[in-house]
């Protein structure tokens, strides 16, 4: 056997047929924020009217969609993030460039699955949507200091994230 033939005999097969893990992705709001239920309601409505599927297909992420549970917005009586956002007139979304979730088009505008869904939430709130590039390692601090209102960027919902954000 030649060297190449011998190598092929011992070539490793790195193909796995089993799924090793399942990751869940989502947006992150401040702990106790009523913005969480507003986003959940908006996502549920977008699923019901077909908007969620259409946006997912536009960016090729439809296989990642999960069923959105029915959700009704519950406003906080004290320290409402929704009221705060409406008062200032802007939903500030913390992102990083992460296609197909958030990235810039040829004109420098933010697009992507998460960017489009964040714009939909801002539209439902009746406010402008502003995207701010954040240092990913400081995302919780950015939220807590109100530099941003939501982290929305293909974020894996780890135990650490779930403990620090809604």
What do these predicted regions represent?
Residues 38, 42-63:
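Periplasmic-binding protein-like
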Residues 69-79:
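Structural transition elements
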Residues 19, 56-71:
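Local pocket/hinge segments that shape ligand/substrate recognition
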Residues 27-30, 92-96, 166:
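Hydrophobic/proline-rich hinge and linker segments of small-molecule sensing/allosteric domains
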Residues 1-21, 138, 154-164:
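A ligand-binding cleft/hinge motif common to bilobed small-molecule-binding domains
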């Amino acid at each position: 056997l030649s060297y190449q033939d011998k190598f092929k005999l011992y070539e490793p097969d790195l193909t796995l047929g089993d799924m090793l893990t399942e990751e869940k992705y989502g947006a992150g709001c401040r702990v106790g924020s009523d913005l969480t239920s507003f986003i959940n309601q908006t996502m549920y409505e977008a699923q019901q009217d077909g908007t969620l599927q259409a946006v997912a297909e536009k960016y090729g992420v439809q296989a990642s969609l999960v069923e959105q549970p029915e959700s009704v917005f519950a406003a906080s009586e004290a320290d409402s993030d929704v009221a705060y956002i409406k008062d200032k007139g802007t939903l500030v979304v913390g992102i990083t460039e992460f296609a197909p979730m958030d990235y810039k088009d040829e004109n420098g505008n933010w697009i992507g699955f998460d960017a489009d869904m964040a714009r939909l939430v801002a539209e439902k709130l009746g406010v402008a949507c502003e995207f701010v590039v954040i240092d990913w390692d400081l995302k919780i601090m950015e939220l807590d200091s109100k530099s941003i209102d939501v982290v929305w960027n293909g974020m894996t919902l780890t135990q650490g994230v779930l403990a620090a954000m809604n």
